[in-house]
Amino acid sequence: MQIEDNTFFDPSRKEVSHEQYRFSVEYRIEAGFTQHEQRARDLSYQGMFLNGVRVGATFTFNLPLHFGLQTGLLYTLVYGTNEQHWRSMDAPSVQTEYITHRVLEHDFTVPVRLYYTIPVWKKLNLFVFTGPQLQIGLAENDYMQLHLSEGTQNWLQGQGIPTSPYDRMSDELVRANIQWGVGGGIEWDRYRLQGGYDFGLNNLVKHPLVKGQYMSEWGWFASFSYRF
């Protein structure tokens, strides 16, 4: 004797499925390491790596089919050094002099990420994400040290190149850095470990000193977040 199985048409079963993908909002705090890379096309700007931390809060709109849309506000503090070499204007032979740049950068970041979650086992999930983000520069202070002869320093000043500590974002660089990011990570219950890479999309040079002067800022990060 066969017994008809009506569980497929059980309204309570449909309700469980509905609950699994119901719309909700998650709130998280996040902290981690980040590295920014300033990429330049000419010698008037030197490429530089800046290392530091980023902290902030995000909220995610959980959508059906394991998708989610995340945004929030993150604060970043990074620091880096490099040397910019110049031919001496005083030495009789070909000799280089240099400026040591010690740069401290502060910024806010507003990400807009599309997430996709892959359930693995119980509360263990993997996830990937992509989307744009807006990095808003607050300050980029260059605490430079000069190793220049008087003639070289005077020549640089005549070309409009700074030779004293200053904020690069006061008049030199654009504050809005538009990036596109990709990344992923692992999630257990309320905890996430994630990483990603952000590609700089726009030229940050506000007033080019030479034709075609271009600098963009890319970066990667690894962070930990906790869901309330």
Predicted features by range, described:
Residues 52-56, 109-113, 181, 221-223:
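Membrane-embedded beta-strand positions in outer-membrane beta-barrel channels/transporters
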Residues 26-28, 72-74, 128-131:
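Extended hydrophobic secondary-structure segments that form protein cores and membrane-embedded regions
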Residues 57, 97-101, 112-118:
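Short secondary-structure capping micro-motifs at structural edges
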Residues 1-58:
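Short glycine/proline- and aromatic-enriched beta-strand/turn motifs that initiate or cap beta-hairpins
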Residues 34-49, 78-107, 137-179, 203-215, ...:
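Extracellular/periplasm-exposed beta-strand and loop segments of Gram-negative cell-envelope proteins
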Residues 53-81:
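N-terminal hydrophobic signal/anchor transmembrane helix of membrane proteins
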Residues 186, 216-228:
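Outer-membrane beta-barrel "beta-signal"
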Residues 61, 67, 110-206, 228:
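Outer-membrane beta-barrel transmembrane domain signature
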